[in-house]
Amino acid sequence: MSFFISDAVAATGAPAQGSPMSLILMLVVFGLIFYFMILRPQQKRTKEHKKLMDSIAKGDEVLTNGGLVGRVTKVAENGYIAIALNDTTEVVIKRDFVAAVLPKGTMKAL
């Protein structure tokens, strides 16, 4: 009985191998999908954020990543800005931590 099993296993042979070109093509397709779905949008967001950071000027109303809303009072060349939260409180933060530049008059509406 066991000799029939060994004959059946030997008759199936080795599984067919795919061509290496199909593997390379699949890797290229996955690389392109990764680039267009992840890297390209991230580069676009980074470029827009850098443009936003360069456009910050004195008097702009900004929203920080921490949720603070204030008016820019000073813009330093070393990457820091001073934000007045109210008449008495001023905070110095890195320019990179600005999440958005708000329309004029937003602070008065709050």
UniProtKB/Swiss-Prot annotation:
<keyword id="KW-0811">Translocation</keyword>
<dbReference type="Pfam" id="PF02699">
    <property type="entry name" value="YajC"/>
</dbReference>
<protein>
    <recommendedName>
        <fullName>Sec translocon accessory complex subunit YajC</fullName>
    </recommendedName>
</protein>
<keyword id="KW-0812">Transmembrane</keyword>
<keyword id="KW-1133">Transmembrane helix</keyword>
<comment type="function">
    <text>The SecYEG-SecDF-YajC-YidC holo-translocon (HTL) protein secretase/insertase is a supercomplex required for protein secretion, insertion of proteins into membranes, and assembly of membrane protein complexes. The SecYEG complex is essential for assembly of a number of proteins and complexes, assembly is facilitated in the presence of the SecDF-YajC-YidC subcomplex.</text>
</comment>
<keyword id="KW-0813">Transport</keyword>
<keyword id="KW-0472">Membrane</keyword>
<dbReference type="GO" id="GO:0031522">
    <property type="term" value="C:cell envelope Sec protein transport complex"/>
</dbReference>
<comment type="subunit">
    <text>Part of the SecDF-YidC-YajC translocase complex; YajC is also present in a homooligomeric complex in excess of the other components. The SecDF-YidC-YajC translocase forms a supercomplex with SecYEG, called the holo-translocon (HTL). The stoichiometry of the super complex may be SecYEG:YidC:SecDF 4:3:1, YajC is in the reconstituted complex (with SecDF) but as no antibody is available it could not be quantified.</text>
</comment>
<dbReference type="GO" id="GO:0032978">
    <property type="term" value="P:protein insertion into membrane from inner side"/>
</dbReference>
<comment type="similarity">
    <text>Belongs to the YajC family.</text>
</comment>
<dbReference type="InterPro" id="IPR003849">
    <property type="entry name" value="Preprotein_translocase_YajC"/>
</dbReference>
<keyword id="KW-0653">Protein transport</keyword>
<dbReference type="GO" id="GO:0043952">
    <property type="term" value="P:protein transport by the Sec complex"/>
</dbReference>
<keyword id="KW-1003">Cell membrane</keyword>
<feature type="transmembrane region" description="Helical">
    <location>
        <begin position="19"/>
        <end position="39"/>
    </location>
</feature>
<dbReference type="GO" id="GO:0016020">
    <property type="term" value="C:membrane"/>
</dbReference>
<dbReference type="GO" id="GO:0005886">
    <property type="term" value="C:plasma membrane"/>
</dbReference>
<keyword id="KW-0997">Cell inner membrane</keyword>
